[in-house]
Amino acid sequence: SWTIDTAQIEQLLRDDTGHRIRALIVINPNNPTGSYVKPGEREQLVTLCRAYDVAIIADEVFFDYALEPFEGNRRFSGERGVLTFALDGFSKTLAAPHAKVGWIRVSGPGDDVREATRRLDVIADDFLPMSELVARAVPPMLATAPDQLQRVRARTQGNLRRLHELLRADTLGVVDVLRAEGGWNVLLRFPSVIDENELVLSLMEHAGASGQPGYFFDMPSNGYLALSLLAEPERFASNVRLVLGAVARALDVSD
């Protein structure tokens, strides 16, 4: 699993004698690693931010899309121990990229929340106003959210199960998937002797398909490809087979 280097964060905060660090940003769960902030990490981060007077900005748009989570995951939304801004929106809740309606939940100590809310009101009014047309659409979109969440969860969880089946059945056996705790994407790992760019170019040349290499996400080494779990099941299985075929060609062991 993935872990947060809280010791390094503490060192950065301690060294920031000019108090230039004003907020800590967390993605919960992260994309594309799919890793949630673990309970112990959350406690440490809240304690550090409170001690150094730093706010938390938590992007939790994928939180409801659990895949293979560990126990004890919680949203930062509603955190009372430190000033917290939790981000969410319809584009992920409804799996609708065109639904550009987002919101921020502010929580924490009362005085901090009141001051932050006052300032956010000014920002929202001056720079991010919502039209009446969009505002009218919010209630019906909220009403559809539970059913849409369930449909997307069923799709992503089903595709992840199918991915495990296809990888187990692959006779070459050199591709695996990192544990995905939540979200819409997974990271495939293949032999690092294969250049990520060359693999993607091979997919484009031989299958008219593409992918996101690991270096797009600052992965620490070569040999990763991000794969979406949102595709229709048949298309998803085909995509996996295309990747396995590209890996086999790269290793010069294809049939």
Put a short name on every predicted segment:
Residues 2-71:
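Active-site phosphate-binding strand-loop segment of PLP-dependent enzymes
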Residues 10, 14-15, 202-211, 217-255:
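PLP-dependent enzyme catalytic core of the Aspartate aminotransferase-like
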Residues 49, 77, 167, 203-204:
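A generic structural signal for well-ordered alpha-helical segments
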Residues 51-52, 80, 207, 250:
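Helix C-cap/helix->beta junction micro-motif
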Residues 78-157, 252:
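Conserved core segment of the aminotransferase class I/II
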Residues 105, 187-189, 228-230:
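Short hydrophobic/aromatic beta-strand micro-patches
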Residues 139, 154-164, 175-190, 221:
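Conserved glycine-rich beta-strand-loop-beta hairpin in the small C-terminal domain of fold type I
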Residues 173-177, 210-215:
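A short linear hydrophobic-aromatic micro-motif
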